[in-house]
Amino acid sequence: VPGPADEPTASQADPVEGVLFDIDDTLVDLEQAMGHVLQAIPDPALSHLGDDDWVRYKALYTTDPQRHYDRFLAGELTFEEQRVHRVRHARAGFTPEPFLGRVAEAWVRDYEQLLPQHFRAYDDVVPLLDALEARGIPYGAVSNNVHDYQRAKLDRAGLQRIGVLVGIDTVGVAKPDPAIYREGARLIGAAPSRTLYVGDNRLVDAVGARDAGLIGVWLDRTGAGRDRGVDSGTGAATGAEGVPEVPCIAGLAAVLQFLPSVR
């Protein structure tokens, strides 16, 4: 994993003039929110699960190893259907009970009602936004979900100040298509080559943004060194071989290292 020595500095010919962020598991702790809700929804078929079982169950849902979210991005599933497929796969490892019909419909209703109650911004988000504003650096978000859903998520997480938001329905494509990153740069008024894009998915966020002409930075909060299935995008590679290295940071405070020095 690249370290600080691999990161650009303010001495570069083209200093950063704008910053874009992924949302899920970058600005908003979606994995924790989903974990809370998965265990909160009453499900008699899972009443026998112990603590370790719940950890594995949640991981099967949040990491989406069968890539059902990609099928949603490709138009093969609705947003609700990809959730049903993911929870069905997770449940299959712990119960033979079917997850169909009214059972699935009731689960989706409960999930949709409960999830927004748990949207929280990471502790390092607001301090970074304060610092960007103090420096006059514009910022925004580019997400692999629809605009209105993500707008509501940001607002619920207390991030109303993020005014620029590009969703997959904004330009009709998903990450890693170059158009979605470039639209974000356009909306914040920054040249792509001078725009930092920060996200938790190494391939879809950091490499995708870099390939679109931005400065891609991988946010690896856990140090796990794995690609996130939750925000995997259509066209993303599944393996690590042959993937170019990109700058890596462990928290958002490190974004300031990429910005011009305050004089």
Predicted regions and their residues:
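Asp-based, Mg2+/Mn2+-dependent phosphohydrolase catalytic module
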Residues: V1-V19, E31-Q32, V126, D130-E133, ...
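Active-site neighborhood of HAD-like aspartate-dependent phosphohydrolases
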Residues: P2-T63
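A generic alpha-helix surface/boundary motif
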Residues: H36, A40, E81-R88, D148, ...
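A ubiquitous structural signal for well-ordered alpha-helices
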Residues: V37, I41, Y57-L60, D64, ...
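Short, surface-exposed acidic
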Residues: L46-A59, G93-R109, R161-I162
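A metal-dependent, Asp-based hydrolase signature
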Residues: T63-D110
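Surface-exposed cleft-lining segments at the edges of enzyme active sites
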Residues: Y111-Q117
